[in-house]
Amino acid sequence: MAKAIAKALLEIEAVSLSPNDPFTWSSGIKSPIYCDNRVTLGYPEVRQHIRDGLCDLIETYFGDVEIVSGTATAGIPHAAYVSEKLALPMNYVRSKSKSHGKQNQIEGALSKGKKVVVIEDLISTGGSSITAVEALREAGADVIGVVAIFTYGLKKADEQFKQAQMPLYTLSNYNELIDVAKENGEISDNDIRSLVDWRDNLS
């Protein structure tokens, strides 16, 4: 599964590698990799594969889930696909409360007293996922885990999830992506060293 997802993300250019001409993230970080899983929405077969994989993770590790929750905004469509297949209620969590109306941070199914799994598209530092987890907990939810499409495998993310005592499972990861890119002849051994060094030094 991890290899197939990595291959698909590379093929549709949801993930791009550029060791010699780094991308600039919105945070200002210079990175040899850029991941935009929103691209998957334009590829029905890929998004169905992702949906089925996320469902498998949830059924394997969080079989007693009662609500699926997506992180705004990129996690929302995948949460919708998963909740539809599993026939479960869904909500989504904003990064902060609205400034108008009822000022809700969580929209959709009520979480209080319910076992909830959070769906995220991408794990970088883990900040957005943990923000969603904390908001759901404040609303009285029993958040039992997070599942995501892809992770960079940064130590900061590992530390955040550990501190929050929150299990995390992903469909694919940085190491798998590098392996697939090498098999495809897209990167050299020097590129691999550069990619690994970036991840380890950023951590």
From Swiss-Prot:
Alphabetical list of InterPro entries matching this protein: OPRT, Or_phspho_trans_dom, PRibTrfase_dom, PRTase-like
Cofactor dependence: Mg(2+)
Positions bound to orotate: S124
GO biological process: 'de novo' UMP biosynthetic process; pyrimidine nucleobase biosynthetic process
Record's catalysed reaction(s): orotidine 5'-phosphate + diphosphate = orotate + 5-phospho-alpha-D-ribose 1-diphosphate
Top EC class of this enzyme: transferase
EC number: 2.4.2.10
Keyword set includes Protease: no
Binding site for 5-phospho-alpha-D-ribose 1-diphosphate: R94, K98, H100, E120, D121, L122, I123, S124, T125, G126, G127, S128
Keywords, ordered alphabetically: Glycosyltransferase, Magnesium, Pyrimidine biosynthesis, Transferase
HAMAP family for this protein: PyrE (MF_01208)
Function: Catalyzes the transfer of a ribosyl phosphate group from 5-phosphoribose 1-diphosphate to orotate, leading to the formation of orotidine monophosphate (OMP).
Family: Belongs to the purine/pyrimidine phosphoribosyltransferase family. PyrE subfamily.
Subunit note: Homodimer.
The protein's name in its UniProt record: Orotate phosphoribosyltransferase
Protein's organism: Staphylococcus saprophyticus subsp. saprophyticus (strain ATCC 15305 / DSM 20229 / NCIMB 8711 / NCTC 7292 / S-41)
